[in-house]
Curated annotation (Swiss-Prot):
GO BP, one annotated term: tRNA wobble uridine modification
Protein location: Cytoplasm
Cofactor note: Binds 4 [4Fe-4S] clusters per heterotetramer. Contains two stable clusters in the N-termini of NBP35 and two labile, bridging clusters between subunits of the NBP35-CFD1 heterotetramer.
Annotated keywords: 4Fe-4S, ATP-binding, Cytoplasm, Iron, Iron-sulfur, Metal-binding, Nucleotide-binding
Residue sites binding ATP per the record: 25-32
InterPro entries registered for this protein in UniProt: Mrp/NBP35_ATP-bd, NUBP2/Cfd1_eukaryotes, P-loop_NTPase, YlxH/NBP35
Cofactor: [4Fe-4S] cluster
Record protein name field: Cytosolic Fe-S cluster assembly factor CFD1
Assembly notes: Heterotetramer of 2 NBP35 and 2 CFD1 chains.
GO function terms (MF aspect): 4 iron, 4 sulfur cluster binding; ATP binding; ATP hydrolysis activity; ATP-dependent FeS chaperone activity; iron-sulfur cluster binding; metal ion binding
Annotated residues for binding of [4Fe-4S] cluster: 214, 217
Organism listed in the record: Candida albicans (strain SC5314 / ATCC MYA-2876)
Family (UniProt): Belongs to the Mrp/NBP35 ATP-binding proteins family. NUBP2/CFD1 subfamily.
Length: 294
């Protein structure tokens, strides 16, 4: 990497090895759920993971991770992301796990019901601040993966993050989340075109809500159509990372950790039917052996 380019890299991400965006062509496909589970899976594999939520008008990740009531703190280097899971405080059976931290506008709103009614320039400024002023990792403890959860479609937030990340190359690329229905896969094509225009590598497609896991017998039934994501991957010569069914148990685990402070989602997730499925998806990404940024 040239010295000129190094000068442009935000100091906040100079200790980040890998950057992955999670995108979706339309809303309601469960993108934030996939982001949450990819983060949990990487942490379970021993990686230190940070999650940046740039869905400014619908920041749901603080609740997904059970840290809605936490606050962002300021340090001499910048904003410190909220710690979701710190393995330094959980030795023993958890010693192989990594650490997990989160930054989201949800921590700054004060009330969960507060709405964000911002025009493009203010959104762009907020995303720049998130990327440049949040301290991700350190020389002693670098961040292995920074996952960036984006809003659906291609909006001001996407343009802003693409502009800011142009100095962060090489970033790993993007995971695109869709559902099996044609109305969702049609919008995925727009997201793919966006990635090509901004030179984001597409790591693969995840077909979410592909089937329904019965809470009584654990049998998976295709209540919707299935195979749309896989067919699109084959048609466009992209990696098909896998399909994730709807599992009511995962929703229950998210709510359980919010109701009981001593429960952490990463520990509850060990018994979730979706865990081996996400393991397979993450392994396909790891098998690409993408180069580290540092």
């Amino acid at each position: 990497m040239s010295s000129e380019l190094l000068q442009e890299v935000p100091k906040s991400i100079e200790h980040v090895k890998h950057i992955i965006l999670i995108l979706s062509g339309k809303g309601g496909v469960g993108k934030s759920s996939v982001t949450t589970q990819v983060a949990l899976t990487l942490v379970n594999k021993g990686f230190n993971v940070g999650v940046l939520d740039i869905d400014l008008t619908g920041p749901s990740l603080p609740r997904m991770f059970g840290v809605e009531n936490k606050q962002v703190h300021q340090s001499t280097q910048g904003w410190v992301p909220v710690s979701v899971y710190n393995n330094n405080n959980n030795q023993g059976t958890d010693s192989k796990r990594g650490n997990l931290s989160l930054m989201s506008l949800g921590f700054l709103l004060g009330d969960r019901g507060n709405s964000v009614v911002w025009r493009g320039p203010k959104k762009t400024a907020m995303i720049k601040q998130f990327l440049k002023d949040v301290v991700w990792g350190s020389t002693e403890t670098p961040l292995d993966y920074l996952l960036i959860d984006t809003p659906p479609g291609t909006s001001d937030e996407h343009i802003a993050i693409a502009e800011e990340l142009r100095w962060a190359n090489p970033i790993d690329g993007a995971i695109i989340v869709t559902t099996p229905q044609q109305v969702a896969t049609a919008d995925v094509r727009k997201e793919i075109n966006f990635c090509k225009k901004v030179n984001f590598q597409i790591l693969g497609i995840v077909e979410n809500m592909s089937g329904f896991i019965c809470p009584h017998c654990s049998e998976c039934t295709n209540i919707f159509s299935s195979g749309g994501g896989k067919a699109l991957s084959e048609q466009l010569n992209l990696t098909y990372l896998g399909n994730v069914p709807i599992d009511p148990q995962f929703v229950e685990l998210v709510e359980l950790q919010n109701e009981q402070e001593n429960k952490k989602l990463i520990e509850l997730y060990d018994d979730c039917e979706l865990k081996p499925i996400l393991n397979g998806i993450v392994d396909k990404i790891l098998d690409k052996n993408l180069p580290s940024r540092i």
